[in-house]
A protein has these predicted regions:
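C-terminal motif of bacterial Sec signal peptides marking the signal peptidase cleavage site
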Residues: 23-27
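An alpha-beta-alpha
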Residues: 163-224, 246
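Beta-alpha junction/loop-to-helix N-cap segments that form part of ligand/metal-binding clefts
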Residues: 36-39, 43, 67-72, 87-156, ...
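Bacterial signal peptide processing site
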Residues: 29-32
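Segments of small-molecule ligand-sensing domains
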Residues: 319-325, 339-393
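Extracellular/periplasmic periplasmic-binding protein-like sensory domains
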Residues: 262-332, 393-395, 399
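Extracytoplasmic "Venus flytrap"
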Residues: 42-77, 97-106, 128-129, 192-203, ...
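Extracellular/periplasmic bilobed ligand-binding domains
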Residues: 205-296
Length: 400
């Protein structure tokens, strides 16, 4: 599929048009004034904003989502530092109150309830695990507390005008794999997906089969595994036996090294196409065994958008050369999105921030993930195609 054809399919997502980072910041630096609300901070620091705006960050810093949570915390910290230095909110300071909910939905909901009951909190940075977010969203929506998520790809997260998600659904940019299918002359494919993960199940049952059908690729086998599976020998043998040109593996990050290794051991020599969970260092243990695997993603440190390059440079400077991953990029964009909404509202009042976020979502903005637009509270980005070269992920030329 050509870039123009993809653009046509996405025309409904691009209504706001491109907004450069500098212009977006300038627009948000001088929002129209409004009456200050009672929530979110103390005495006024000028205009409609208080001296301090308090935000609860419900994160997973321990447990199975700690890898995502710790990287998200770094992206958030960088964004806060830049927002305050930029003067987007004048002299107002952002106070981020971090709460570790690990992977416990009940704990996440409890923290959200605390923020709801305490008017000093202006907004919430929601958890990244879908089960936690689905537990939080109904109560924050009913209470009217602006809450912005990353990850959390399941249904029941973006449930109304107080909830947003800055991780675009994988299905919304998976079509960029179409050009790779054409370039590699892929005519047959097998599909293996994690049936216990809603996002992966959707990709495996709907998105990928539809793309293969559109490209005229014959699906010679489809299989599924459980959410915690770590033995793929049966599936690998079946895929290798069918000898497809490509195997589409839609799995969780920790599953990929094992699945790819067992697939290669079974004699498979075709192309391997995956999902963004292949990134963020998850193929490091597979090394050269996984070389050549490709996947579409919402962010890679090598993408060419100016706003992405600016983020990567700032992140590496702050964290001693560490290369940012998608978790950090999404959290960075989330914090900037919330800050822009607050600036637009010129108020720490929860309802005013909700209206400010809508105004920013309607316009879109340039961030770490490139140009970000929204559809019904869900972020959309063009996406990029990346490849594992055996030691690191690299941008596939023309893969956007």
């Amino acid at each position: 599929m050509t870039r123009d054809a993809r653009a046509g399919r996405r025309s409904l997502l691009a209504g706001a048009g491109a907004v450069t980072l500098a212009l977006a910041l300038a627009a948000c630096s001088s929002p129209g004034s409004s009456d200050s609300g009672s929530s979110g901070g103390g005495s006024s620091g000028g205009g409609g904003l208080p001296d301090t705006i308090k935000i609860m960050d419900i994160n997973g810093l321990t447990g199975p989502v700690a890898f995502a949570g710790s990287n998200a915390a770094k992206g958030t910290a960088l964004a806060v530092e830049q927002i305050e230095a930029d003067g987007l909110l004048g002299d107002t300071k952002l106070e981020i109150d971090s709460k570790d909910a690990a992977a416990d939905p009940q704990q996440a909901a409890s923290f959200a309830s605390q923020a709801i009951a305490d008017p000093s909190y202006a907004a919430i940075l929601g958890p990244s695990a879908s089960a936690q977010s689905a537990a939080v969203s109904p109560i924050v929506q009913q209470a009217g507390v602006p809450t912005v998520y990353v990850q959390s790809g399941s249904e029941g997260v973006v449930v109304g005008d107080f909830t947003y998600r800055l991780t675009p659904p994988a299905a919304s940019y998976y079509d960029i794999v179409g050009d790779y299918i054409d370039d590699q002359s892929i005519k047959t494919a097998s599909v293996l997906f994690n049936a216990g993960n809603p996002t992966l199940a959707q990709l495996g049952q709907d998105t990928v089969p539809a793309l293969l059908d559109e490209k005229g690729v014959e699906t010679v086998g489809t299989g599924s595994v459980e959410v915690t599976a770590q033995d793929f020998t049966t599936s690998a043998s079946q895929i290798a036996g069918a000898k497809p040109d490509a195997a589409f593996l839609l799995l969780t990050g920790p599953q990929y090294p094992v699945a790819i290794g067992q697939l290669k051991q079974a004699g498979f020599t075709g192309k391997i196409v995956g999902f963004s969970a292949m990134g963020a260092g998850n193929l490091t243990s597979a090394g050269q065994t996984a070389a050549g695997a490709v996947w579409p993603t919402n962010f890679t440190a090598d993408q060419t958008d100016e706003s992405s390059k600016t983020f990567v440079e700032a992140y590496e400077k702050k964290y001693d050369g560490e290369v940012p991953n998608n978790y950090a990029a999404e959290a960075y964009d989330r914090m900037w999105f919330l800050a822009r909404g607050i600036a637009e509202a010129d108020s720490a009042d929860r309802a005013a921030i909700k209206d400010g976020l809508k105004a920013i979502a309607d316009k879109g903005f340039d961030g770490a993930q490139g140009h970000v637009t929204f559809e019904d509270g869900d972020a959309r980005v063009p996406g990029v195609l990346v490849e594992w070269d055996g030691t690191k992920e690299i941008l596939v030329e023309g893969g956007s």
